[in-house]
């Protein structure tokens, strides 16, 4: 099955639209002021207070203890972590805060993909482009080196026209943000169209 995580959400109406049209996860960027999608803690608390059955994801780069402590009482089911943390540190974060972990790896080569083996504690491995928010992609065929029992997420300039091809590689979660924006703001029409396309692909696969 193809699932979708919509990342970089910053307004209640956008979260509501994601919930309405079937996103599996809603992502919120924290402690990363370089990004126009970065949220204050107050805003993150507001956006994650909505009652729904989807998963809220705190997206962070190399979070420190103080930052992790500051969000421990917010309604997050997953922490998505970028950076070069030791696998033991990832395991400690998971146990201490009782959350599921999405470990992000930046991908350029096969060797980058194989780094997933280090992070046994991660619930999901995110394979992202080296550009992070710079709208770059990577060769998705590299994911053939990852066993099917590893739960996978893919990011990096994913467009609506890419969904059919990605869905044929394997069951996967697509992590999308910039493709659903107009002038650096989430576009409700683009969110709707993207999520309806995901739904269409899944329905066609069951026929």
Describe each PLM feature range.
Residues 1-207:
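Conserved N-terminal beta1-alpha1 strand-loop-helix module at the mouth
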């Amino acid at each position: 099955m193809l699932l979708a995580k919509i990342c970089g959400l910053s307004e209640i109406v956008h979260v509501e639209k994601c919930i309405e049209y079937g996103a599996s996860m809603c992502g919120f960027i924290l402690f990363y002021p370089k990004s126009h999608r970065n949220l204050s803690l107050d805003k993150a608390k507001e956006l994650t207070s909505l009652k729904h059955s989807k998963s809220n994801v705190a997206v962070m780069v190399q979070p420190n203890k103080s930052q992790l402590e500051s969000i421990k009482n917010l309604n997050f089911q997953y922490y998505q972590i970028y950076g070069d943390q030791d696998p033991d540190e990832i395991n400690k974060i998971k146990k201490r805060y009782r959350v599921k972990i999405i470990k992000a790896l930046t991908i350029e080569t096969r060797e980058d993909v194989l780094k997933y083996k280090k992070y046994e504690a991660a619930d999901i491995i995110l394979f992202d482009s080296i550009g992070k928010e710079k709208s770059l992609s990577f060769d998705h065929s590299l994911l053939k080196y990852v066993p099917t029992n590893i739960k996978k997420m893919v990011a990096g300039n994913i467009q609506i026209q890419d969904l059919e091809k990605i869905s044929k590689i394997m069951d996967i979660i697509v992590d999308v943000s910039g493709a659903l924006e107009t002038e650096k703001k989430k576009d409700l029409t683009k969110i709707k169209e993207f999520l309806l396309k995901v739904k269409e692909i899944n329905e066609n696969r069951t026929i």
